Amino acid sequence: MPTLVYIHGGPGGGVTFGLFPQFMHIVPQVDPYPTATMAGAGYAILFPMPRGGAGYGEAGQRAIVNAWGEPDYKDIMAGVDQLVAQGVADPNRLGVMGASYGGYMTNWIVTQTGRFKAASAGASLSDLSDTFYLSEGGAFLIDYFKRPWENRDGYAAHSPLTFADKVTTPLLIQHGEADPRVPIAGAWKFYRALKAMGKTVELEVYPRGGHVLREPMQQREQMRRNMEWFAKWIRTGS
């Protein structure tokens, strides 16, 4: 069946379950990816818990130091492969989505593989140096990559923007205009890079929106657009 991969934020977060999965490291919120509704529409939903996230102890979290997009990417794709092997996931109808670090991983994944037919990245990082310099909390990257002038190669090698030319998956980028945690500059840079290369990409900017959208009408529109995006690119017929 068509399968959507939901990647949690963090990276040190995780997923709880209910009508809407919540990021464990952020206050309760309406998630932009209504997975219960998506499941009702005929999608299988994979909630991977890759290394770097909650539940693996210090060693598991340190596995992604100077290595974002490496062991975590392998873990996510191993989960996809398992569902395909079990006959649950149709390998020709895969989608990937996530916000914050989940958005970063979504951006990263579409630069590394063409297996997904559609992707949606919310409040996502594309240029790690930008995040360090422009985010109100960018100093957290020091724990993973040191400072940009101390590790230029590491920042570039783990930034999706560096590999924008590799993207073949249609990508929807959603971002709050006033996001203080992951400034919108990165979304614009990734969008313009992909657009300049003729890639299939759309950018939705939510006025007044922060790292998490708080206005009910914007929350509803964000969910609606995600449902619409995956329906457009992934056929849900059994």
Model-derived regions, located:
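Active-site-proximal cap/loop segments of hydrolase catalytic domains
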Residues: 6, 22-238
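Short beta-strand element of the alpha/beta-hydrolase
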Residues: 1-10
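Serine-hydrolase catalytic-loop signature spanning alpha/beta hydrolases and amidase-signature enzymes
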Residues: 11-13, 45
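A flexible loop/linker signature enriched in serine peptidases of the S9 family
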Residues: 16-17
